[in-house]
Design a protein with these regions (language model features):
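Acidic, Ser/Thr- and proline-rich intrinsically disordered linker/docking segments
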Residues: 2-14, 19-84, 89-141
Length: 141
């Protein structure tokens, strides 16, 4: 079932199926960014200038992180002082670097690489490793 939301951004109105959005990013200044499905266009919502749409996004993020949704594996990952909420089932490739153990993956509807380090971000790293093992059957070593 689709989860359609109307968002106002830069004097335009977008109607977006949030079930097709693969990642959201909370920034330290309170802004929330997501990328339109099937393209790399970021939508950045500021709570000071667009409180109504900001609340819609927060409500959806709360819903997806609390519910056990079929065909999704939503996780919170802290990366470069931002909190990303990512559906790992939408990620189609992972790159593992044996010397230091880092894992890199790219957000499907964005161009941003996410690099997870086992030393500096052990909780997020473990979530990604577990997902890779469960989904692909491959073990990183």
């Amino acid at each position: 079932m689709a989860y359609w939301v109307k968002i106002s951004y830069e004097r335009k109105e977008y109607v977006v199926n949030f079930e097709r959005v693969s990642a959201f990013c909370y920034e330290q200044n309170g802004r929330v960014t997501f990328w339109l499905p099937d393209c790399a266009i970021p939508i950045v919502i500021n709570p000071q200038s667009n409180q109504q749409d900001y609340q819609k996004i927060l409500k959806y993020i709360q819903y997806i992180t609390e519910a056990q949704l079929e065909n999704s594996y939503w996780v919170k990952i802290y990366y470069e002082r931002n909190e990303y909420v990512i559906n790992l089932n939408c990620i189609s490739s992972f790159c593992y670097e044996p010397p230091n153990g880092r894992i890199t993956f790219w957000l499907p509807d964005g161009i941003i690489p996410i690099i997870i380090n086992p030393v500096s971000n052990p909780e997020s790293y473990e979530k990604v490793v577990n997902h890779i093992q469960k989904t692909t059957g491959h073990f990183l070593s």
